[in-house]
Amino acid sequence: MLPALALSVRQPWAWAIIHGGKVIENRTRGAIESGGMTTGRIAIHAAGGLKEDEYRWGAWRLAKHGVFCPRPDELPRSALIGAVSVTEIVETSDSEWFGGPCGLVLAGPEPCEPIPATGALGYFRWEPGGELAPVLPWMRHWDRPGGDNATGELFPDLDRSFREPPPKPFGSRR
């Protein structure tokens, strides 16, 4: 049974919280206060939006932590994907996941089958309904020139990575 309160997080970060060992969700103090965010068990909602530059930067950032997320067309969106406990809210942390200015410290992730639902800002009471966000054209061809994945299969023993970090699609560059 999922908790009644949920937090909407954009992919691939929602996936990383549930499956990839991401132990801090970064937010501003204003977002935490206005969103009613406190400690306790919450559901994680994968937000509906995802732009190619967001995914590209997120996948690169996760790989720096040794976490390799699924392709964008394999990440559910507009759905609850699991639950996690918020154990504290911090303004500083030595965690590699902390980007500030504040962070929700997370523990005990439990995945669930995706449950379509509409998200909202801050903590929100979720209700099942709607549909998963559709796979977008750019997602179908991710890392597949010609749509056939031939390039990725040429050198299966090499890690897929970027020579240079892709540009951060939001906020200041860290």
Describe the residue ranges of each PLM region:
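Structured alpha/beta reader/binder surfaces that contact nucleic acids or chromatin modification marks
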Residues: 1-174
